[in-house]
Amino acid sequence: MPQAKKRTSTKRKGNKKTNKKKQNETPLRYIFSIIVVILIILGAFQLGIIGRMIDSFFNYLFGMSRYLTYILVLIATIFITYSKQIPRTRRSIGAIVLQLALLFIAQLYFHFSHNITSQREPVLSFVYKAYEQTHFPNFGGGLIGFYLLKLFIPLISIVGVIIITILLLASSFILLLNLRHRDVTKSLFDNLKSSSNHASESIKQKREQNKIKKEEKAQLKEAKIERKKQKKSRQNNNVIKDVSDFPEISQSDDIPIYGHNEQEDKRPNTANQRQKRVLDNEQFQQSLPSTKNQSINNNQPSTTAENNQQQSQAEGSISEAGEEANIEYTVPPLSLLKQPTKQKTTSKAEVQRKGQVLESTLKNFGVNAKVTQIKIGPAVTQYEIQPAQGVKVSKIVNLHNDIALALAAKDVRIEAPIPGRSAVGIEVPNDKISLVTLKEVLEDKFPSKYKLEVGIGRDISGDPISIQLNEMPHLLVAGSTGSGKSVCINGIITSILLNTKPHEVKLMLIDPKMVELNVYNGIPHLLIPVVTNPHKASQALEKIVSEMERRYDLFQHSSTRNIEGYNQYIRKQNEELDEKQPELPYIVVIVDELADLMMVAGKEVENAIQRITQMARAAGIHLIVATQRPSVDVITGIIKNNIPSRIAFAVSSQTDSRTIIGAGGAEKLLGKGDMLYVGNGESTTTRIQGAFLSDQEVQDVVNYVVEQQKANYVKEMEPDAPVDKSEMKSEDALYDEAYLFVIEKQKASTSLLQRQFRIGYNRASRLMDDLERNQVIGPQKGSKPRQILVDLENDEV
């Protein structure tokens, strides 16, 4: 007990001593800080002899930057006095760096103002002379500044000193303001990037405006010439660009409207020319020396004696190059397609009223925006709105449902922003979808100089859209059932038949559904009959891969790089050697339902598609793949990455839309041919109303083609007959029993074989591998049961 008391008493005595010591230090600190402040004030204002001496000393050391030294010393003194702590290291370093930067600035100013070129004499003597000859305010950076400049100018030149000064000044502000270098550099780069993007956008916008002005001038000239020739005024539903042309339905500003109606109104003016072009084509066909029994006007030309000798399924060979040209063959006339009927479209007064409703709706939700342009398309009308400055685009996008409610629309699609323009596009469905036919899409470019140009439909502005397969170079078409996918495929095939001859383009059609493409059996453009067996389809794709490799061998021996160069080489050889060596035709492979092929032979089909899409462009082979199940197990990453051009029809979810085109939007399409198209190298989608083609029109074109020339199938390209899987054997003695057991139970798994035959896991796994290799069972798909591909009654399902 006494010892404990002694310890506590000694602790109390120690605490008392430290407290007394702190109390004694406090007045000394205040006295020291007061003295420092007084000396700084005397020196800064040069008060008395002491003040002039202090200022002279600091001027000799720091020059014109001494005033910053006064301020820094004063701030540090006050901070230490009241906070009883030394300033943070980061800000202390920032103050020192700022002092150093000002030393460089002051000395550089003195250096340039006195035209100092070299300093051969010693620094101290030079500084002393300058100090004696110079008044206080103009004495450079003092002794320290002279030494620094004397050191750095020979090392990094005067330009390097200026750059270092700027960097020191920037670093000092970053340190003093306690900022992060990463944040500063990031914000700097972001500002530079945004400014460069803004500059590039403004340049693009100016170019587009100039282009639009040129187009408008050209259109005005054409309109004047047309008025003089026809002596008629423009129709009310032409493109309206003048405010006076609008019906006065309100006091608001009128909006220019561009639309699908323009295309319909221009059609009668050029109908005579088009009819004349078709008649000239028919007269030319009649003038050809042939033994036709019927006229071409009846669309049923008879074949020549040479064509009659060809069998419907004669076996040919493509071992050398291609097929010899048939001089008697003529492409089908466009008159085989039905003339589109004029339909009642949305009135412009109604469209303008909806534009005003749209403006008022946005204004009610606090969004200041103005409708600047309206485009009436076949299926939707696009309202182009320009938001005021400071309005976020996301705010307009979030009003999606409110806009649909105000316009009484089924659904609206917002394109924010429109690519290349400072505006937002709001696409509203029309009350009635205008039918777009393939004839009106093709008639402006028929016959096309490009062999693989096919018609797709009309865009929002009503302009016809056609694509060239050799530029795509491969196409993915996907959408739900009934969305217009099969009609699009028929339009592509019919466009090829209308534009090319059999020796120019060859087709390979794969139709596992067995009902969509069978109508094309027998046309001379086919390499082989339409493939409907999924097992044969994978073999047919392998044949295409072999043909691709063979063509590359031809390119190698002829020192050419692609099919165009090779055909030019063949034409040159024919002229020089007076030969008739045929040219290589383009090959278009069309798969109507990829999901069925992936289900039966997924790995083989995927590998073949990968090789074709990666290498076949130069060989003149192009692939079109269609599917109604746009899931990731059908459209795999490998297939998607190698097919750059895609068409998305209406789908059920945004996930499916992202699987097809890599972005949402297809889930808001209207169906019936409404599609989103993404071309090769494009990052934005184009909304198109697909061209409609009836079954009767397809049949008429097919009949015309078949009557002129029969199919000449290539035996080398035909897939082998499917192997009878019941005769396949395995090294395992239990294979036959396992085969019968699996097709009887219609299910298969490793554990099931283990229990049934009382074998180990390894042997059962080998049996499963043999069954999969022989295409008795499908591949494994996670936790899902394997699909059985055969049964007892019918060997192939």
From Swiss-Prot:
GO terms for biological process: cell division; chromosome segregation. One of its GO terms (molecular function) is ATP binding. Residues 1-22, 199-320, 331-350 are annotated as: Disordered. Residues 282-313, 338-349 have a biased composition (Polar residues). The chain crosses the membrane at residues 31-51, 60-80, 92-112, 151-171. ATP binds at residues 482-487. Keywords: ATP-binding, Cell cycle, Cell division, Cell membrane, Chromosome partition, DNA-binding, Membrane, Nucleotide-binding, Transmembrane, Transmembrane helix. GO terms for cellular component: plasma membrane. Residues 462-658 form the FtsK domain. The keyword Zinc does not apply. Residues 201-225 have a biased composition (Basic and acidic residues). Its main location: membrane. Residues 172-797 are cytoplasmic. It comes from the Bacteria. Residues 1-21 have a biased composition (Basic residues). It is a multi-pass membrane protein. It holds the Pfam family FtsK_SpoIIIE. Belongs to the FtsK/SpoIIIE/SftA family. Essential cell division protein that coordinates cell division and chromosome segregation. The N-terminus is involved in assembly of the cell-division machinery. The C-terminus functions as a DNA motor that moves dsDNA in an ATP-dependent manner towards the dif recombination site, which is located within the replication terminus region. Required for activation of the Xer recombinase, allowing activation of chromosome unlinking by recombination. Consists of an N-terminal domain, which is sufficient for the localization to the septal ring and is required for cell division, followed by a linker domain, and a C-terminal domain, which forms the translocation motor involved in chromosome segregation. The C-terminal domain can be further subdivided into alpha, beta and gamma subdomains. The alpha and beta subdomains form the DNA pump, and the gamma subdomain is a regulatory subdomain. Homohexamer. Forms a ring that surrounds DNA. This is DNA translocase FtsK.
